[in-house]
Protein backbone atom coordinates (compact mmCIF):
# COMPACT_ATOMS: atom_id res chain seq x y z
CA UNK A 1 0.00 0.00 0.00
CA UNK A 2 1.12 3.47 -0.75
CA UNK A 3 1.29 6.08 2.00
CA UNK A 4 -1.02 9.08 1.62
CA UNK A 5 0.52 12.34 0.45
CA UNK A 6 1.36 14.84 3.16
CA UNK A 7 -0.44 18.16 3.04
CA UNK A 8 1.48 21.12 1.81
CA UNK A 9 3.10 23.58 4.20
CA UNK A 10 2.92 27.31 3.47
CA UNK A 11 5.85 29.42 4.74
CA UNK A 12 5.23 33.11 5.39
CA UNK A 13 7.48 35.65 3.64
CA UNK A 14 9.52 35.44 0.50
CA UNK A 15 12.51 33.29 -0.18
CA UNK A 16 15.88 34.91 0.41
CA UNK A 17 17.83 35.32 -2.76
CA UNK A 18 21.51 34.59 -2.78
CA UNK A 19 23.53 37.73 -2.57
CA UNK A 20 26.19 37.95 -5.19
CA UNK A 21 29.32 39.84 -4.24
CA UNK A 22 29.75 42.99 -6.25
CA UNK A 23 33.19 43.38 -7.74
CA UNK A 24 34.54 46.54 -9.27
CA UNK A 25 35.07 46.57 -12.98
CA UNK A 26 38.56 45.95 -14.29
CA UNK A 27 40.65 49.07 -14.62
CA UNK A 28 43.42 49.39 -17.19
CA UNK A 29 46.36 51.59 -16.25
CA UNK A 30 48.05 53.77 -18.83
CA UNK A 31 51.82 54.02 -19.26
CA UNK A 32 52.58 56.73 -16.63
CA UNK A 33 50.13 55.18 -14.15
CA UNK A 34 51.67 51.74 -14.57
CA UNK A 35 55.16 53.12 -13.93
CA UNK A 36 54.10 54.87 -10.73
CA UNK A 37 52.01 51.96 -9.46
CA UNK A 38 52.99 50.73 -6.01
CA UNK A 39 51.16 48.25 -3.73
CA UNK A 40 49.41 49.65 -0.70
CA UNK A 41 51.45 49.37 2.45
CA UNK A 42 49.70 48.87 5.77
CA UNK A 43 50.50 51.26 8.57
CA UNK A 44 53.39 50.10 10.65
CA UNK A 45 52.92 49.46 14.31
CA UNK A 46 54.16 52.11 16.64
CA UNK A 47 57.59 51.56 18.05
CA UNK A 48 57.71 50.40 21.62
CA UNK A 49 61.13 51.81 22.34
CA UNK A 50 59.71 54.24 24.86
CA UNK A 51 59.34 57.99 25.27
CA UNK A 52 63.09 58.61 25.03
CA UNK A 53 63.07 57.28 21.45
CA UNK A 54 60.20 59.63 20.59
CA UNK A 55 62.10 62.60 22.03
CA UNK A 56 65.20 61.75 20.02
CA UNK A 57 63.22 61.32 16.80
CA UNK A 58 61.25 64.53 17.33
CA UNK A 59 64.44 66.51 17.93
CA UNK A 60 66.16 65.14 14.85
CA UNK A 61 63.24 65.52 12.46
CA UNK A 62 62.96 68.92 10.74
CA UNK A 63 59.56 70.49 11.38
CA UNK A 64 57.72 73.66 10.52
CA UNK A 65 55.23 75.28 12.92
CA UNK A 66 52.79 78.16 12.60
CA UNK A 67 54.75 80.31 15.07
CA UNK A 68 57.90 79.79 13.07
CA UNK A 69 56.15 80.91 9.90
CA UNK A 70 54.83 84.02 11.66
CA UNK A 71 58.28 84.91 13.00
CA UNK A 72 59.80 84.36 9.56
CA UNK A 73 57.19 86.62 7.96
CA UNK A 74 57.79 89.32 10.59
CA UNK A 75 61.54 89.20 10.13
CA UNK A 76 61.11 89.38 6.37
CA UNK A 77 58.93 92.50 6.61
CA UNK A 78 61.37 94.06 9.07
CA UNK A 79 64.27 93.36 6.73
CA UNK A 80 62.45 94.91 3.79
CA UNK A 81 61.68 98.00 5.88
CA UNK A 82 65.31 98.32 6.96
CA UNK A 83 66.52 98.04 3.38
CA UNK A 84 63.99 100.62 2.19
CA UNK A 85 64.92 103.05 4.96
CA UNK A 86 68.59 102.53 4.20
CA UNK A 87 68.05 103.33 0.53
CA UNK A 88 66.21 106.51 1.49
CA UNK A 89 68.99 107.58 3.88
CA UNK A 90 71.58 106.89 1.20
CA UNK A 91 69.74 109.05 -1.33
CA UNK A 92 69.35 111.89 1.18
CA UNK A 93 73.03 111.69 2.17
CA UNK A 94 74.07 111.76 -1.49
CA UNK A 95 71.90 114.75 -2.26
CA UNK A 96 73.08 116.72 0.81
CA UNK A 97 76.69 115.52 0.35
CA UNK A 98 76.76 114.19 3.91
CA UNK A 99 79.79 111.90 3.47
CA UNK A 100 79.78 110.67 7.08
CA UNK A 101 76.19 109.48 6.80
CA UNK A 102 76.96 108.00 3.39
CA UNK A 103 79.85 106.01 4.87
CA UNK A 104 77.57 104.77 7.64
CA UNK A 105 75.01 103.67 5.05
CA UNK A 106 77.73 101.80 3.14
CA UNK A 107 78.86 100.04 6.33
CA UNK A 108 75.26 99.13 7.12
CA UNK A 109 74.80 97.78 3.61
CA UNK A 110 77.85 95.55 4.03
CA UNK A 111 76.56 94.25 7.36
CA UNK A 112 73.10 93.59 5.93
CA UNK A 113 74.63 91.84 2.92
CA UNK A 114 76.69 89.60 5.17
CA UNK A 115 73.60 88.79 7.24
CA UNK A 116 71.52 87.98 4.18
CA UNK A 117 74.28 85.74 2.86
CA UNK A 118 74.50 83.91 6.19
CA UNK A 119 70.73 83.41 6.33
CA UNK A 120 70.72 82.15 2.75
CA UNK A 121 73.47 79.66 3.58
CA UNK A 122 71.62 78.40 6.65
CA UNK A 123 68.39 78.12 4.65
CA UNK A 124 70.18 76.11 1.99
CA UNK A 125 71.51 73.70 4.61
CA UNK A 126 68.09 73.31 6.20
CA UNK A 127 66.58 72.76 2.75
CA UNK A 128 69.21 70.11 2.03
CA UNK A 129 68.33 68.38 5.30
CA UNK A 130 64.65 68.32 4.34
CA UNK A 131 65.49 67.12 0.84
CA UNK A 132 67.09 64.04 2.36
CA UNK A 133 63.68 63.05 3.74
CA UNK A 134 62.17 63.44 0.26
CA UNK A 135 64.98 61.31 -1.18
CA UNK A 136 64.14 58.56 1.30
CA UNK A 137 60.51 58.69 0.17
CA UNK A 138 61.62 58.51 -3.45
CA UNK A 139 63.86 55.55 -2.67
CA UNK A 140 60.96 53.83 -0.91
CA UNK A 141 58.85 54.27 -4.05
CA UNK A 142 61.64 52.93 -6.24
CA UNK A 143 61.88 49.83 -4.04
CA UNK A 144 58.31 49.02 -5.14
CA UNK A 145 58.66 50.12 -8.77
CA UNK A 146 58.87 47.70 -11.68
CA UNK A 147 59.65 50.43 -14.20
CA UNK A 148 63.08 51.20 -15.65
CA UNK A 149 65.15 54.30 -16.26
CA UNK A 150 65.13 56.08 -12.88
CA UNK A 151 67.00 53.78 -10.54
CA UNK A 152 70.49 54.20 -11.97
CA UNK A 153 70.35 58.01 -12.10
CA UNK A 154 69.00 58.11 -8.55
CA UNK A 155 71.78 55.88 -7.19
CA UNK A 156 74.48 57.81 -9.05
CA UNK A 157 73.15 61.02 -7.49
CA UNK A 158 73.37 59.47 -4.02
CA UNK A 159 76.93 58.32 -4.65
CA UNK A 160 77.91 61.80 -5.84
CA UNK A 161 76.35 63.45 -2.77
CA UNK A 162 78.22 61.08 -0.47
CA UNK A 163 81.53 61.84 -2.20
CA UNK A 164 82.09 58.27 -3.43
CA UNK A 165 84.61 58.29 -6.26
CA UNK A 166 83.76 56.54 -9.52
CA UNK A 167 86.79 54.30 -9.06
CA UNK A 168 85.66 53.05 -5.65
CA UNK A 169 85.62 49.21 -5.58
CA UNK A 170 82.06 49.02 -4.22
CA UNK A 171 80.74 51.36 -6.90
CA UNK A 172 82.59 49.42 -9.58
CA UNK A 173 81.01 46.16 -8.34
CA UNK A 174 77.60 47.82 -8.50
CA UNK A 175 78.19 48.96 -12.08
CA UNK A 176 79.25 45.42 -13.01
CA UNK A 177 76.12 43.91 -11.40
CA UNK A 178 73.50 46.09 -13.11
CA UNK A 179 72.28 45.98 -16.71
CA UNK A 180 69.63 47.69 -18.80
CA UNK A 181 66.96 44.99 -18.43
CA UNK A 182 66.78 45.33 -14.65
CA UNK A 183 63.97 47.30 -13.04
CA UNK A 184 64.44 50.28 -10.76
CA UNK A 185 63.69 48.07 -7.77
CA UNK A 186 66.50 45.67 -8.62
CA UNK A 187 69.01 48.45 -9.32
CA UNK A 188 68.29 50.32 -6.07
CA UNK A 189 68.33 47.05 -4.12
CA UNK A 190 71.77 46.24 -5.51
CA UNK A 191 72.99 49.71 -4.53
CA UNK A 192 71.59 49.23 -1.03
CA UNK A 193 73.40 45.91 -0.65
CA UNK A 194 76.73 46.80 -2.31
CA UNK A 195 77.48 50.53 -2.01
CA UNK A 196 75.39 51.77 0.93
CA UNK A 197 76.96 49.37 3.49
CA UNK A 198 80.31 51.11 2.89
CA UNK A 199 78.93 54.35 4.36
CA UNK A 200 76.91 52.54 7.01
CA UNK A 201 79.98 50.72 8.32
CA UNK A 202 81.85 54.01 8.64
CA UNK A 203 78.92 55.55 10.52
CA UNK A 204 78.78 52.53 12.83
CA UNK A 205 82.48 52.91 13.59
CA UNK A 206 81.97 56.59 14.41
CA UNK A 207 79.10 55.74 16.75
CA UNK A 208 81.02 52.93 18.41
CA UNK A 209 84.11 55.09 18.92
CA UNK A 210 82.16 58.03 20.34
CA UNK A 211 80.17 55.78 22.67
CA UNK A 212 83.35 54.08 23.89
CA UNK A 213 85.10 57.40 24.47
CA UNK A 214 82.10 58.72 26.41
CA UNK A 215 82.00 55.57 28.52
CA UNK A 216 85.70 55.58 29.40
CA UNK A 217 85.90 59.34 29.94
CA UNK A 218 82.99 59.46 32.37
CA UNK A 219 84.20 56.34 34.13
CA UNK A 220 87.52 57.98 35.04
CA UNK A 221 86.47 61.64 35.38
CA UNK A 222 85.94 62.87 38.96
CA UNK A 223 84.07 66.07 37.97
CA UNK A 224 80.42 66.12 36.90
CA UNK A 225 80.89 69.43 35.05
CA UNK A 226 83.64 67.89 32.94
CA UNK A 227 81.33 64.96 32.19
CA UNK A 228 78.56 67.23 30.92
CA UNK A 229 80.89 69.32 28.78
CA UNK A 230 82.51 66.20 27.33
CA UNK A 231 79.14 64.61 26.50
CA UNK A 232 77.95 67.80 24.77
CA UNK A 233 81.11 68.13 22.72
CA UNK A 234 81.23 64.45 21.71
CA UNK A 235 77.56 64.32 20.73
CA UNK A 236 77.71 67.43 18.57
CA UNK A 237 80.87 66.16 16.93
CA UNK A 238 79.26 62.77 16.29
CA UNK A 239 76.22 64.36 14.63
CA UNK A 240 78.43 66.52 12.41
CA UNK A 241 80.57 63.55 11.36
CA UNK A 242 77.59 61.36 10.50
CA UNK A 243 75.92 64.15 8.54
CA UNK A 244 79.13 64.91 6.63
CA UNK A 245 79.61 61.21 5.94
CA UNK A 246 76.24 61.03 4.18
CA UNK A 247 76.81 64.27 2.27
CA UNK A 248 74.85 66.67 4.52
CA UNK A 249 76.31 69.84 6.00
CA UNK A 250 74.59 70.97 9.19
CA UNK A 251 74.20 74.69 9.80
CA UNK A 252 73.95 76.77 12.94
CA UNK A 253 70.17 76.44 13.28
CA UNK A 254 70.31 72.70 12.68
CA UNK A 255 72.70 72.41 15.60
CA UNK A 256 70.39 74.53 17.74
CA UNK A 257 67.56 72.14 16.96
CA UNK A 258 69.67 69.28 18.26
CA UNK A 259 70.90 71.17 21.31
CA UNK A 260 67.96 70.22 23.52
CA UNK A 261 68.63 66.59 22.68
CA UNK A 262 72.23 67.05 23.80
CA UNK A 263 70.96 68.58 27.06
CA UNK A 264 68.76 65.52 27.54
CA UNK A 265 71.76 63.30 27.00
CA UNK A 266 73.84 65.30 29.49
CA UNK A 267 71.07 65.05 32.07
CA UNK A 268 71.03 61.29 31.65
CA UNK A 269 74.79 61.25 32.12
CA UNK A 270 74.22 62.41 35.70
CA UNK A 271 71.25 60.12 36.31
CA UNK A 272 72.56 56.90 34.81
CA UNK A 273 72.99 55.20 38.16
CA UNK A 274 69.95 53.17 37.08
CA UNK A 275 72.28 51.17 34.88
CA UNK A 276 73.76 49.69 38.05
CA UNK A 277 70.34 48.48 39.16
CA UNK A 278 69.55 46.71 35.89
CA UNK A 279 73.12 45.61 35.28
CA UNK A 280 72.30 42.04 36.25
CA UNK A 281 70.17 41.72 33.13
CA UNK A 282 73.03 42.81 30.88
CA UNK A 283 76.12 41.32 32.46
CA UNK A 284 77.16 38.41 34.57
CA UNK A 285 77.15 38.52 38.35
CA UNK A 286 80.92 38.86 38.51
CA UNK A 287 81.19 41.87 36.19
CA UNK A 288 78.24 43.68 37.78
CA UNK A 289 79.84 43.23 41.17
CA UNK A 290 83.12 44.73 39.93
CA UNK A 291 81.48 47.77 38.35
CA UNK A 292 81.92 51.01 40.23
CA UNK A 293 79.38 53.81 40.25
CA UNK A 294 81.40 55.84 37.75
CA UNK A 295 81.75 52.86 35.42
CA UNK A 296 77.99 52.30 35.52
CA UNK A 297 77.41 55.96 34.70
CA UNK A 298 79.86 55.66 31.83
CA UNK A 299 77.94 52.73 30.35
CA UNK A 300 74.70 54.71 30.60
CA UNK A 301 76.20 57.74 28.86
CA UNK A 302 77.76 55.54 26.18
CA UNK A 303 74.44 53.86 25.43
CA UNK A 304 72.70 57.22 25.15
CA UNK A 305 75.42 58.48 22.81
CA UNK A 306 74.95 55.37 20.68
CA UNK A 307 71.18 55.94 20.61
CA UNK A 308 71.71 59.52 19.46
CA UNK A 309 74.09 58.34 16.75
CA UNK A 310 71.62 55.73 15.50
CA UNK A 311 68.86 58.32 15.18
CA UNK A 312 71.18 60.79 13.44
CA UNK A 313 72.26 58.01 11.10
CA UNK A 314 68.62 57.20 10.34
CA UNK A 315 67.90 60.87 9.57
CA UNK A 316 70.91 61.41 7.30
CA UNK A 317 70.73 58.07 5.49
CA UNK A 318 69.32 58.44 1.95
CA UNK A 319 67.78 54.95 1.81
CA UNK A 320 65.21 53.39 4.14
CA UNK A 321 66.25 50.47 6.31
CA UNK A 322 65.88 47.04 4.74
CA UNK A 323 65.44 43.79 6.65
CA UNK A 324 67.88 43.83 9.58
CA UNK A 325 70.18 46.61 8.31
CA UNK A 326 69.26 49.01 11.10
CA UNK A 327 71.89 48.99 13.86
CA UNK A 328 70.64 47.83 17.22
CA UNK A 329 71.46 49.38 20.53
CA UNK A 330 72.23 45.93 21.89
CA UNK A 331 75.18 45.58 19.50
CA UNK A 332 76.82 48.72 20.86
CA UNK A 333 75.95 47.65 24.39
CA UNK A 334 77.85 44.41 23.93
CA UNK A 335 80.82 46.32 22.52
CA UNK A 336 80.86 48.69 25.49
CA UNK A 337 80.61 45.82 27.95
CA UNK A 338 83.41 43.98 26.16
CA UNK A 339 85.66 47.05 26.29
CA UNK A 340 84.80 47.54 29.94
CA UNK A 341 85.67 43.92 30.69
CA UNK A 342 89.01 44.37 28.94
CA UNK A 343 89.72 47.56 30.88
CA UNK A 344 88.84 45.94 34.20
CA UNK A 345 90.98 42.89 33.42
CA UNK A 346 94.01 45.13 32.75
CA UNK A 347 93.46 47.15 35.91
CA UNK A 348 95.83 46.05 38.70
CA UNK A 349 94.02 44.40 41.56
Curated annotation (Swiss-Prot):
Cross-referenced InterPro entries: DUF697, UPF0283
Segments crossing the lipid bilayer: 70-90, 99-119, 213-233
UniProt GO cellular component terms: plasma membrane
Pfam families, A to Z: DUF697 (PF05128)
Membrane topology: Multi-pass membrane protein
Keyword Chaperone listed: no
UniProtKB keywords: Cell inner membrane, Cell membrane, Membrane, Transmembrane, Transmembrane helix
Localisation: Cell inner membrane
Family the UniProt entry places it in: Belongs to the UPF0283 family.
Protein name as it appears in the record: UPF0283 membrane protein Ent638_2153
Organism name: Enterobacter sp. (strain 638)
Classification of source organism: Bacteria, Pseudomonadati, Pseudomonadota, Gammaproteobacteria, Enterobacterales
Amino acid sequence: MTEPLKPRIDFPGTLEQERAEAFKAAQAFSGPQAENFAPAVAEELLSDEGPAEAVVEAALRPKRSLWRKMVTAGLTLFGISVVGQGVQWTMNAWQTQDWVALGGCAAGALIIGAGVGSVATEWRRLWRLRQRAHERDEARDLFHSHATGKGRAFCEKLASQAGIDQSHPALQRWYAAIHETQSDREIVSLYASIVQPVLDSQARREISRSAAESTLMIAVSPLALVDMAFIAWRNLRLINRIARLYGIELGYYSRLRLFRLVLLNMAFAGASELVREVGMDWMSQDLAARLSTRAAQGIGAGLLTARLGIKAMELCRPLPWLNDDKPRLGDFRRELIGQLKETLSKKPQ
